[in-house]
Amino acid sequence: MASNNVAQFAAELKMPAGVLLEQLQAAGVQKASEDDALSEADKARLLDHLRKSHGATDGDKRKITLTRKHTSEIKQSDATGKARTIQVEVRKKRTFVKRDDVAEGAEQGQAQVAEADDDAELKRREEEARREAELLEKQAQELRERQERLEREEAERRAREEAAEAQRRRAEEEAAAKRAAAAAVEAQQVAAQQAAEAQQETAGAQSAQDEARAAAERAAQREAAKKAEDAAREAADKTRAEQEEIRKRREAAEAEARAIREMMNTPRKAMVKAVEPPKPVEPPKPVEAKGTLHKPAKPAGASAARPAVKKPAGAAPATTAPAGAGDRNKKPGGGKGGWQDDAAKRRGIKTRGDSSGGVDRGWRGGPKGRGRHQDSASTFQAPTEPIVREVHVPETVSVADLAHKMSIKASEVIKVMMKMGQMVTINQVLDQETAMIVVEELGHRAVAAKLDDPEALLVEGETTTDAEQLPRPPVVTVMGHVDHGKTSLLDHIRRAKVAAGEAGGITQHIGAYHVETPRGVITFLDTPGHEAFTAMRARGAKATDIVVLVVAADDGVMPQTKEAIAHAKAGGVPIVVAINKIDKPEANPDRVKQELVAEGVVPEEYGGDSPFVPVSAKTGVGIDDLLENVLLQAEVLELKAPIEAPAKGIVIEAKLDKGKGPVATILVQSGTLNRGDVVLAGSAYGRVRAMLDENGKPTKEAGPSIPVEIQGLSEVPGAGEEVIVLPDERKAREIALFRQGKFRDVKLAKQQAAKLESMLEQMGEGEVQNLPLIIKADVQGSQEALVQSLLKLSTDEVRVQIVHSAVGGISENDVNLATASKAVIIGFNTRADAQARKLAESNGIDIRYYNIIYDAVDEVKAAMSGMLAPEKREVITGMVEVRQVFKVPKIGTVAGCMVTDGIVKRSSSVRVLRNNVVIFTGELESLKRFKDDVKEVKQGFECGMSVKNFNDVTEGDQFEVFEVTEVARTL
């Protein structure tokens, strides 16, 4: 902290303020109280006084030698052409001599010059002193002339003011005279008028003329008086303006004179300081505290005058040798020319906290002298406001990138995340939510960034085609509960036998068919009704125009029926209800209608908008009415789509065929899909190599609302992905690769974020059993359904862990993964190849095959039940009453007992009850009857018993005998 007054400086020196005031008075510094301010010059004068009073001499000179060493390497080829590395070490040595001021520095610089040079130096200094005196005299003469000029201007100003005052007085006198003359004239006129009236009282016409004349004269006199007053006012305003202008000129002249005085004072002190030896009375003197060598920063005049004084001291070496390589050969203490000419050395030695860049710094770096040259102004740093940045956070970002966006160190981000309970590294990828929380925690504003993704080109690059909107067939999704006859109804419509081909008689795949009727084409989507296929049904409702809700007349509304209604309402799709199985004796269509009304589906006959059609998939009753109602709804919707345009659609189902590769069933929603088109479906892309209809027959094109199966994609696309035709395969590849990377980054970030949470959960829950599974299915929809169904089986004690799930056959990679993770492989409608089977047998990997989802779920549930810890139950087998107590040496207390209930076995556990309160629980140590060891004693018999580690048995106690049995638990 810099000392600003006497009291603070005394506290810094750890001495009484009164003693310091006495020393300041002795040094010639006039300070009256402890609150008086102290300048650096005052402190310097006090220091000089104390040095002189203690007998310090100016001849005590010390010097400092700095040695710099720089090592570098160069590579040079020898005669054989082989490169060699040579170490080059450059050493530089400089000597600094302590100086009190510029004059003494010049004398020290000339210490090695001969005595004859001293006389020349003295003459040169006298000449410079004479020139400085002449310059000062000239400046003083100029100042006197300017002061005389200012005095003349002041006299002129006063003269002008007096003249203006005299003019103002004259104007006032003239105005008063005019007013008096006007009053006299008016009095004469009044008297004349009265005389005229007295003389000519009878002449009325003549007096009227006289009155008019008098009124005109009075008006003229008033006008003249008004003009005189205006002239006087203008003269006064002009006088005031002149006075204001004179005052401004005087102030400007005084300010100029003050500036001249300050200008004259500043260089005079600096030049005297540069020529004459330092005097205690001169304030601008170098501050020397505690024997340091530094000098305070000088004003511009001093810095301009200093080279003129320094130059002769080092002129000889600076002028005789050129700058450059010759300067490097000079000795460190030989002169100042080499130090000043070298641009790298001119910057000086940097010290910590010095922001001057080495300019005009007279101190070295080092632990003892560090920071002493700073004045009080440089030590204070104003507080700055925290900078709040707007940070754009992408979907995934590493810790280092996030820190760079906030302009802070990565270690700060890591510290904040450690406080939040998450251990991260500098290269770890964070998801968007976590990164935004960290940004908010650090006081910045987080904004979800919009990525420069190539998908934006899809929207920007869409050319508006003028293709004509033509009517298209309706897309009808058949939905309902399992076993309500959806597929059988479609079979009757298609005249096919699809249901017989499904395993277990239930639909486990989403199917797409189009049917040609006399009134038009209808495209049907058949969705599974099992509860596991929720995602499939949601995809079917998303791509549909009309929903046919199939409800069995004998079963009514079931859970999946309600779910189908919810999907249809969420998509805003009209519903046509088909009440199936009306040919059964127990069919009750009216009950079905009432249940559907309760769910919000009101029939048309009740005033609603949903047609109800009773049908029988077995006999074909009502099929035509159903198709009629579907086409009627389609006409109301007025479904249209462009045909002559690039195709767009949706992936209904996807699978991996061993011979064909990735195969996708897509529904074209607009445009026409041709064989050879480049398609993009999610992260998969490719050229359509083959296109088949639902019957497996090749086709060249597919229009709106037509389902087709395409081949040629790079990978199996996700079910529900949008399919779009692009003109360029390069653009399709770019977008697909971008989507793959984004999906991978997001998945990795979420996995890393969940690692610590799951670890802490497992630590808190104790030992949790894991059932690792690898699932391979024939199509993606079945794989999704099976994964979701199995994950729902997880409990607090046994957890289902899906290590890997994919579409396709079971390969060696799957078996190797199962070996590493100790997982069970489940194949749903898929099989393992020969190599995978052989590898699984050698590694003991269990592979299970299923074709019905019920069986897979039930067997996994049974396996999880076997992993549950068995439940321990206590079974009370008998009660014993203590009749007598015996003390047996080396054995302890033996109780003579009567078995009052049940049976007592040797291996049982026992509780000791006293007054129906349990006082001990342990095991039987011995069980005897008539001195013979027995295994059991039944009710009504006496026996002798001893309890292990318990001898405090009294008569009247009861022993409760029990056994612990383990019971297997089930889910």
From Swiss-Prot:
G4: annotated span: 580-583
Domain tr-type G: 471-640
GO molecular function, one term: GTP binding
InterPro entries named in the record: DNA-bd_dom_put_sf, EF-G-like_DII, IF2_assoc_dom_bac, IF2_II, IF2_N, P-loop_NTPase, Small_GTP-bd, T_Tr_GTP-bd_dom
Sequence segments annotated as region (G2): 505-509
Main location per the UniProt record: cytoplasm
Gene3D superfamilies hit by this protein: P-loop containing nucleotide triphosphate hydrolases (3.40.50.300), Putative DNA-binding domain, N-terminal subdomain of bacterial translation initiation factor IF2 (3.30.56.50), Translation factors (2.40.30.10), Translation initiation factor IF- 2, domain 3 (3.40.50.10050)
Residues covered by region (G5): 616-618
CDD domains (UniProt xref): IF2_eIF5B (cd01887), IF2_mtIF2_II (cd03702), mtIF2_IVc (cd03692)
Disordered as annotated region, ranges: 49-86, 101-385
Keywords in alphabetical order: Cytoplasm, GTP-binding, Initiation factor, Nucleotide-binding, Protein biosynthesis
Stretches with biased composition (Pro residues): 277-286
Annotated SUPFAM superfamilies: Initiation factor IF2/eIF5b, domain 3, P-loop containing nucleoside triphosphate hydrolases, Putative DNA-binding domain, Translation proteins
Region (G3): 526-529
NCBIfam families tied to this protein: IF-2, small_GTP
Name of the featured protein: Translation initiation factor IF-2
UniProt organism field: Burkholderia ambifaria (strain ATCC BAA-244 / DSM 16087 / CCUG 44356 / LMG 19182 / AMMD)
